[in-house]
């Protein structure tokens, strides 16, 4: 991996800078390096468990034109459980992700306090799901969505005005003319990080081709493509070389778009003058509340979550 030294410190060391917080849950660095006993840890070794690639810092989105929505008040995860937004809230129907959106909301609203928000106990899962099921019965949640495309359709159809929303949906909604924004929660973002692994059975030319593929992901071009839907890549400067100055300024540097910008398909999605919520990459990466994590009690969580969405 000749470009390993260019991979962002966010994944190689755990934070983007000395003043940044690592966040609760399984920060990628904690399971990145393979040790001599085959365990995974943050201690650097010559072996990695995966090649860190695409990542982002998620929050919730809102339609600025929806009745009763005030952008000035959308600064806390607590808004997802705000009685004033009764019947307008959507949550992603993926327990390993949606649980963090609602846990951050419950804690920010002062309704619950968790020992470790990245790894809830059975009792904490029960208490949180009981609260959510009650809110659902009262009509607080308007819907639960399964895919980014479905979320886009639901917000376009005015099924919800506030809720879980990912960057591809934000880009697609902006392309449709919806005045949607992602919140910048004071509590921090829910972060996630993808990566690529190799099968231990690869040999010869197959293994060489697999390494060529991994290195291609670090070449910069793939990162430029995913940047146009709001995602970040672990080799920041490589990506910069494949974006126009205007694209780099908007997607990574946090500046206002100096011209209309395309999505990955080439269709205009970002209009001139727009500013990305949360600002620059380094600012967003410094404000992580929790990482997407498969909790110790994941199986129990899935069963309880099913009661919520059924």
Language model region names:
Residues 78-81, 103, 129-133, 152, ...:
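Non-transmembrane alpha-helical segments in soluble domains
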Residues 59-67, 105, 193-206, 225-226:
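A bilobed periplasmic-binding-protein/Venus flytrap-type ligand-binding module shared by bacterial periplasmic
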Residues 198-276:
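Mature extracytoplasmic/periplasmic domains
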Residues 140-203, 247:
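Extracytoplasmic/periplasmic substrate-binding proteins
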Residues 64, 84, 93, 106-110, ...:
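Sec/Tat-exported extracytoplasmic proteins
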Residues 28-30, 85-88, 137-140, 157-161, ...:
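Loop/turn elements at helix/coil->beta-strand transitions in domains of secreted/extracellular proteins
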Residues 265-310:
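Conserved C-terminal helix/tail region of periplasmic/extracytoplasmic solute-binding proteins
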Residues 2-152:
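Extracytoplasmic ligand-binding site segments that recognize negatively charged/polar headgroups
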């Amino acid at each position: 991996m000749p470009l390993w030294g260019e991979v962002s410190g966010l994944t190689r060391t755990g934070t983007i800078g000395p003043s940044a917080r690592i966040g609760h849950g399984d920060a990628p660095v904690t399971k990145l390096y393979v040790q001599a006993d085959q365990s995974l840890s943050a201690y650097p070794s010559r072996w990695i468990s995966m090649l860190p690639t695409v990542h982002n810092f998620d929050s919730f989105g809102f339609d600025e034109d929806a009745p009763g929505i005030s952008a000035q008040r959308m600064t806390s995860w607590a808004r997802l459980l705000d009685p004033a937004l009764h019947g307008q809230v959507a949550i992603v129907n993926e327990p390993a992700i949606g649980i963090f959106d609602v846990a951050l909301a419950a804690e920010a609203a002062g309704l619950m306090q968790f020992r470790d928000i990245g790894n809830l106990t059975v009792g904490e899962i029960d208490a949180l799901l009981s609260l959510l099921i009650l809110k659902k019965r009262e009509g607080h949640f308007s819907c639960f969505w399964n895919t980014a495309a479905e979320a886009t359709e639901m917000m376009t159809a005015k099924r919800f005005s506030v809720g879980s929303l990912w960057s591809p949906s934000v880009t697609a909604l902006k392309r449709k003319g919806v005045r949607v924004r992602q919140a910048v929660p004071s509590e921090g973002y829910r972060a996630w990080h993808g990566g690529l692994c190799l099968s231990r059975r690869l040999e010869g030319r197959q293994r060489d081709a697999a390494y060529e593929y991994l290195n291609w992901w670090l070449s910069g071009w793939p990162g430029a493509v995913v940047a146009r839907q709001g995602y970040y890549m672990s080799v920041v400067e490589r990506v910069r070389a494949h974006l126009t100055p205007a694209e780099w300024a908007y997607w990574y540097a946090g500046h206002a778009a100096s011209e209309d910008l395309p999505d990955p398909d080439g269709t205009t999605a970002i209009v001139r003058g727009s500013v990305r919520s949360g600002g620059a990459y380094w600012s967003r990466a410094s404000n992580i509340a929790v990482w997407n994590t498969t909790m110790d009690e994941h199986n129990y969580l899935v069963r309880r979550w099913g009661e919520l969405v059924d």
